């Protein structure tokens, strides 16, 4: 599942077990720290910005709540806005989630779209791609070295100790969001998978070919916010997509559980 967890929807500690009980094996949650009251950047989905963007929970706190009451559920960010995050703090948060969940964390990353939100974090939108790449590489250094250091254009720190280290080795998988050549280059550099958002199957095949030409490997593809009709799911399967994350609307508990029952029936044929 991919969703926005908010103060108005189902609680993560209820949602996690409900997913496991229905044979749904992953929970990926979105991140926005805030929404500026004055915004010029258009919403990529068109129209007004949905209410859930204004009210989203901190992803790592929410995923930790789900981790505490589940045993097998994958717990991922979809996506963590790395360009708005301190890499040392982020390394500790992801590693802690991986530890408390017994090795179930997935670090989904992206460069974001809301320029005003970025600026409030001191990020220049024009250089956010290079900033993201450095911060992800710095996080990996912090995860994998007893004494980590990093010296780049945007990230610079002398040798430090940063614990805990992740349970997964060498580190939690990094799923790279976004599309196009820049995203494919990031997958080649540090990604375990490419995570496009809602790309229809008829367009995805050509993009997968370009991705794998860039990476030189049979790179896994995880579709975030996938359409929930059986025809699309069949086409994704035929393309070799490893996983689809169906979009779960943000609703109160009863309505969410009813929707999960519908999803469980839909995905049963693909297990």
Language model feature labels by segment:
Residues 1-271:
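Active-site-adjacent structural elements that line small-molecule/cofactor binding pockets in enzymes
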